[in-house]
Amino acid sequence: MELFRKITVLSLEQATVLPYLTYRLAIDGCRVIRLEHPVFGDPNRLVGEPFLEGEERMNSYFMAINAGKEALTLNLGEPRGQEILSRLIRDLNVDIFATNQLPRNYQKLGIGYEDLKAIKPDLIWLGITGFGPESNEVAYDPILQARGGLMALTGEASGTPQVVGIPLPDMGTSEHAYGLLMKALFTRAVTGRGTRIDVSMFESTTSWLTVPITMTCSFGKNISRRGNTHEFFAPVSVYPTADGYCYIAVGNDKQFQAFSSLPEFSSLAKEEYRKNSGRIADVENLNQMISRTTRTMSTESLVFLMKNIGVAASRISTIEEVARDPLVFPKLIRAKDEKTGFELTLAPPPVAAPLLESNGRRLSFPPRFGEHNSAILTRELGIPSDELTLLKSDGVI
């Protein structure tokens, strides 16, 4: 929305959880300025392959969630760095300050809510931590998947626990925080008051365990890994085809009746399979019978057959195939580097803001390390260039 162009976000960020959130805000049209330490910076800048010849801290992994932002380097461990932070918040009229630093660093860096609220009373302050504001335990996505129960639910029953293929606790926490920021912006628009938001990645992760926690704690059921099958519905699984694999998900008894009415699957039209409970009770044999038939069919013909009777089915797409999907390809985001001409292709948001649509789904290229120091500190804050040089030599920026 155009109104998001009036929102300025200052984010002391690194890794994935907070950069993905601010990337979402940049897509909406917010001005996002990422803060990094002038020596260490965001470690994710060094992850993946370097692809811009002769340039450091612009590796491939960093590119995916940092387009549309500006970048400042600032040493908040220095008093002069904290003075600049105060000026940034005040002079740029910052609406949202966000950090995923450990809570023990808040006071040392001068970034605590009370400190920044004193500078701008209506500031919205967001702190993302692994296990809450009282904990300084380091948390990375796989650790959250392990402790948060996701690994216990992922993988084959006879195999080892597995992580899911994307950093779900990271990105899911970002989505939860996004919603909380929208609520805070609305509250501020109505009341004029800012707020403090603390988001725990662990609590975000465990909030998704709706069925597992209820089934375990209320009904004493052991919810565990089941590979590609479903705990409560059958047949639901990946089935082999003559040229690959197909996922079929029969969601209710009516769909199974249509499924078993097909000549190819008529052997499944048994009284004991009429209800889902009977199919679950004999799911191993059921899946073996289905697999014997699907092996003789092409993936395309099987998917076509299932869709014709209202049963959900899909081939197992590669990422390249997903990017070419007609529902995805037109919505991909592009970000072109004006210096080298290199163009990034970025995943689309679930719903594109009108501003993104109006500019042809284009964002500015992910910022280089400290790229906007001069533009922001000199042109907007009025710090003379010779003072900027001194600040750099002193390790402040």
For the regions a language model picked out, list residue spans one by one.
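N-terminal helix-loop segment corresponding to the beta1-alpha1 unit
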Residues: 1-190, 289, 368, 375-397
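Flexible, small-/acidic-enriched active-site or ligand-binding loops
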Residues: 2, 337-390
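Glycine-rich beta-alpha junction loops
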Residues: 39, 130-132, 201-206, 243-245, ...
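Conserved Rossmann-fold dehydrogenase catalytic segment
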Residues: 133-134, 159-166, 189-205, 221-231, ...
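Mid-domain beta-loop-alpha active-site segment that forms a flexible
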Residues: 167-182, 201-209, 251, 255
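Aromatic-enriched alpha-helical interface/lid elements that frame and gate functional surfaces
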Residues: 235-309, 313
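Conserved PLP cofactor-binding pocket of PLP-dependent enzymes
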Residues: 307-330
